[in-house]
Amino acid sequence: MTPERHVYAAVRDAAARKLKTARSRWPVTLFNSEPARALLAARMRKETKAKAPPEHYPAPYALIDLWETYGGNAAAMQSAEIASFARLIVTSTAQNLVRVFFLRERMKGLADGKWPGNRLHVIGAGAMGGDIAAWCAWHGLTVSLGDVKPEPIAGAIKRAAELYKKIGHKSTEIRDALDRLVPDLRGDGIRSADLVIEAAPERLDLKQRIYAAAEQQMRSDAILATNTSSIALEQLREGLRRPDRFIGLHFFNPVSRMQLVEVVSHDTVDPNVLTAANAFLGRIDRLPTPVRSAPGFLVNRALVPYMMEAFIMLDAGVPKETIDAAAEQFGMPMGPIELADEVGLDICLSVAEHLRGALKPSADGRDMFERPLPEVPQWLQDKVKKGELGRKTGKGLYEWKNGKAVKNPPPAAKPDDPDRAARADDLAEMTDRMILPMVDACVACLRQRVVADEETVDGAMIFGTGFAPFRGGPLHYARTRGIPNVLQALERLAAKYGERFRPDPGWSQLA
């Protein structure tokens, strides 16, 4: 369909002899020739495979096949495309991606309200605090950024300028966003802020000291939020004068790419504060997911067992590239070893130690946290002490160059390899060892009412960890695979590797 005004304009130009002469069609003819299509299609498949493997996402390859076969013949291509679409729309990938779309719309619906505020103060200009401040300033908020030293603030402003150059289209947009991002060494911005976000290191005593000082300056109607990734809000709120206006806003790294933010509640929070927090996240184009205060909340509670199991395999001599390749073959955007480097080994250590202390089985078996976590490996502590923290320092479990992990590709499988079947079994077990503890932790969070329902779990894990979207989320994956099959696999792993794989009691509610 063509808008009417364009038709009138074309007629007027034709009458006035202003229409441009059509260019020669020989480049188009050459482009659509069979040899050219074959060469270009091969290149398209190669480039697409780097982002979307054909076994997981068949649609882009079907489109390339159509163009290679019918390019230049519009009628034949259209007819073939209808048949191709009809075939693809009923695949599990298509059905699950449609589900993911509606999960996202559901989360967006939580942020529909209008946030009345316009001023934000961020305490802590490190990787998370600085990037939260930069993202909010880009979305039109006036943001003051404080820290105890000027160097982190300067570094955050520099990172913001680099980010704005990547996502901005106009120099005026970049200039205005930088103008809205205000260095604030003394913390004066706290007094006028509608929302104060604390993004300090994961130390309970430090955070509580920050709150005590901030509350003395904050407006009575302002909201205080913590970006803690693991500490329970019941501990953090001790000593607060207005605990009803205290919440968790757990962003994920990198802030500019990760859409999910966990909105963490506790039993004394004002419901209006939660509503305002959701609206704030809508203002900055982020997806809120409501979670109840508990160690690790949802995403880290589920992610830590996945990463710890990878560390155990690493200790057993499995190459890190092989571990990551197994996770990526399942559909994860990156493997757990690379993810640990991406997040930062210091953050991994802090969260793992905290969760290991908090998630202890009780003597009577009735404690809400029943699954033991593996011990934190000594080498992880040693790397953190040496400052080998991953991507941000250029070295962690991988060497990093130009923002990418330097990997040795795993050896390619040979078709005539007599041990090929055994290797496939090993790969399947390796994948289950990483993925199923993550799924089991999601079941535990559902049983413990950390989250309200399965849809919240699946949406949060897809948008917070990148859990294979074409699988529809961890709990949807478990239902598709078959809950009895998952339970049998967990029991088999528990018999072979230990109690950490014993299925959570919450599986009975799903079954």
Region spans (language model):
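N-terminal glycine-rich phosphate-binding loop for ADP-containing cofactors
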Residues: M1-A511
